[in-house]
Amino acid sequence: MGSFENVLSSVNEDCRLLCPECSQERKKKNVKTLSVTITENGKVYHCHHCGASGKVPYAGSVIREIKPVRLPPETEPGLVERFLKSRGIEPSKVMSYPVIGGRKFFRGQQDEIEAVGFVYGTPGEITAVKWRGLETKAFTQDGAAQEFYGIHQLPKDVDQLVICEGECDALALNSIGIPAVSVPNGAPQKVSRKQVDPSDDGKYGYVWAARETIEKASRIILATDMDDPGEALAEELARRIGRAKCWRVTFPGKDANDTLLEHGAEALQKAIDEA
């Protein structure tokens, strides 16, 4: 199919494509597993099957302006509270974290469905809203999430920072008083063999964007999921942050939120303390 540069040469908007790395080797050759996000510095790609990721720079000086995301009005009063409680999270403990509720259209759905949106950015500059259906596993995104979720809600003097794989995991930890953030784009399928280059590290640009916060913290807890992609993400984060500063959590559940839901706040606190 050609290189990523060739495949993305004519792309000028966020989309999904066939992955040139793995699509021909799969049984379902026509499934578009390569997500492409247009950023200020290039076209960021990530394959949700083989884990291939990177950034293709723009030819010349052509850069698409990233438009700010407008938040829709709240159309479902109580929906966010209902969702958080269903995940074992006390809403009053995470009120400063931007989560909105409403009805959203997802690909593959016949009509709009109830959904919650995790808001990225600041009140004056919303950069993305990541939506998930309440009753389905449907996901979609408005804008481009390129920073840690919850980074703007952290205490300025945070000494221990927990990094999670999903927004609900970060909310679960914050609800019991543990400062935590979530990566914006999930976990890779495997650890990349590419050398880490901060100037060309599109998928993990959020790590470099939070460098000041990370450097101030004396201890970074990697609280990614208890599966192979979660281990790969923990490894990729440690490569960029520095292994001497990182500790890995072992959860009794699948992740932080499941641990809170199935084992309780004490078990979640214990897992972090014993990292």
Language model segments and positions:
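Short, surface-exposed amphipathic charged segments that create phosphate/polyanion-binding patches used
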Residues: I113-A115, K194-D201, D255-I272
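Phosphate-handling DNA/RNA-contact segment within nucleic-acid enzymes
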Residues: F105-S218, A234
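TOPRIM metal-binding catalytic domain and adjacent DNA-binding surface shared by DnaG-type primases
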Residues: M1-R26, N41-K43, H48-T127, E135-A138, ...
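Short, aromatic/basic amphipathic alpha-helical patches
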Residues: A232-G242
